[in-house]
Curated annotation (Swiss-Prot):
<feature type="region of interest" description="Disordered">
    <location>
        <begin position="1"/>
        <end position="20"/>
    </location>
</feature>
<protein>
    <recommendedName>
        <fullName>Small ribosomal subunit protein eS1</fullName>
    </recommendedName>
</protein>
<dbReference type="InterPro" id="IPR018281">
    <property type="entry name" value="Ribosomal_eS1_CS"/>
</dbReference>
<dbReference type="Pfam" id="PF01015">
    <property type="entry name" value="Ribosomal_S3Ae"/>
</dbReference>
<comment type="similarity">
    <text>Belongs to the eukaryotic ribosomal protein eS1 family.</text>
</comment>
<feature type="modified residue" description="N-acetylalanine; partial">
    <location>
        <position position="2"/>
    </location>
</feature>
<dbReference type="GO" id="GO:0006412">
    <property type="term" value="P:translation"/>
</dbReference>
<dbReference type="GO" id="GO:0022627">
    <property type="term" value="C:cytosolic small ribosomal subunit"/>
</dbReference>
<dbReference type="GO" id="GO:0003735">
    <property type="term" value="F:structural constituent of ribosome"/>
</dbReference>
<dbReference type="InterPro" id="IPR027500">
    <property type="entry name" value="Ribosomal_eS1_euk"/>
</dbReference>
<comment type="subunit">
    <text>Component of the small ribosomal subunit. Mature ribosomes consist of a small (40S) and a large (60S) subunit. The 40S subunit contains about 33 different proteins and 1 molecule of RNA (18S). The 60S subunit contains about 49 different proteins and 3 molecules of RNA (25S, 5.8S and 5S).</text>
</comment>
<keyword id="KW-0007">Acetylation</keyword>
<keyword id="KW-0689">Ribosomal protein</keyword>
<dbReference type="InterPro" id="IPR001593">
    <property type="entry name" value="Ribosomal_eS1"/>
</dbReference>
<keyword id="KW-0963">Cytoplasm</keyword>
<feature type="compositionally biased region" description="Basic residues">
    <location>
        <begin position="1"/>
        <end position="18"/>
    </location>
</feature>
<keyword id="KW-0687">Ribonucleoprotein</keyword>
């Protein structure tokens, strides 16, 4: 006969049941702020463990990267296929001040652009901006039918593709190397693509010309003043103002 423990006979509780603590009770919420170049500044909220001992909450927040749709940042659904990466560089109070970290296309948009009977032309350029950011820009373009064309296909010759790629590289280098990173983020969505389309019209007509990706390779030494100016929080006058006040000599009543 097997001898086992009778579950009906309990000897009593050995100890009280441990109290389960809510993990979110030890966390704080911080507001993520986008640079002033975007129409919408409030990106969202992020949580982090509260500062305890040597573990500082600010250190945990710095370097976090958030991926946000450009349509939400600009209140324009035409940019819904562009994803902007923002990196936390500074924490002030309950606000996380971010800077541009990169841009990419959604996978469904890229797949919708690739079609039959046309040539795909790609180019990538590594450029240093005027404020010493090293970025790599990836461009994409597709050939389209001419107005008088009867043939169904729009394949470009190898020599034409090389000439178009050369023009793409020249335009991207010219536009990116003469501007700051902030100015470049404004040009990336539409302006550079239109410039490429206009310049290559004589070689072969193009359509769907975009900067599909921007990758940040290297950034300069962190500048707090520059970041605050980017967020519109830097004071216009850094110098103190002189206060006009009459000098009154204090007389000691007792020595």
């Amino acid at each position: 006969m097997a001898v086992g423990k009778n579950k009906r006979l309990s000897k009593g509780k050995k100890g009280l049941k441990k109290r389960v603590q809510d993990p979110f009770s030890r966390k704080d919420e911080y507001l993520v702020k986008a640079p002033s170049t975007f129409a919408v500044r409030d990106v969202g909220k992020t949580i982090v463990n509260r500062t305890t001992g040597l573990k500082n909450a600010n250190d945990s927040l710095k370097g976090r990267i958030f991926e946000v749709s450009l349509a939400d940042l600009q209140n324009d659904q035409a940019h819904s296929f562009r994803k902007i990466k923002l990196r936390v560089d500074e924490v002030q109070g309950k606000n996380c001040l971010t800077n541009f970290h990169g841009m990419d296309f959604t996978s469904d948009k890229l797949r919708s652009l690739v079609r039959k009977w046309q040539s795909l032309i790609e180019a990538n350029v590594t450029v240093k901006t005027t404020d010493d950011y090293l970025v790599r820009l990836f461009a994409i373009a597709f050939t389209k039918r001419r107005s008088f064309q009867v043939k169904k296909t729009t394949y470009a010759r190898s020599s034409q593709i090389r000439a178009i790629r050369k023009k793409m590289v020249e335009i991207i280098q010219r536009e990116a190397s003469s501007r700051t990173l902030t100015q470049l983020t404004k040009l990336v969505p539409e302006v550079i693509g239109r410039e490429i389309e206009k310049a290559t019209r004589g070689i072969y007509p193009l359509q769907n010309v975009h900067i599909r990706k921007v990758k940040l390779l290297k950034q300069p030494k962190f500048d707090l003043g520059g970041l605050l100016a980017l967020h519109g929080e830097a004071s216009t006058d850094d110098k103190g103002q002189k206060v006009e006040r009459e000098f009154t000599e204090q007389v000691l009543e007792s020595v």
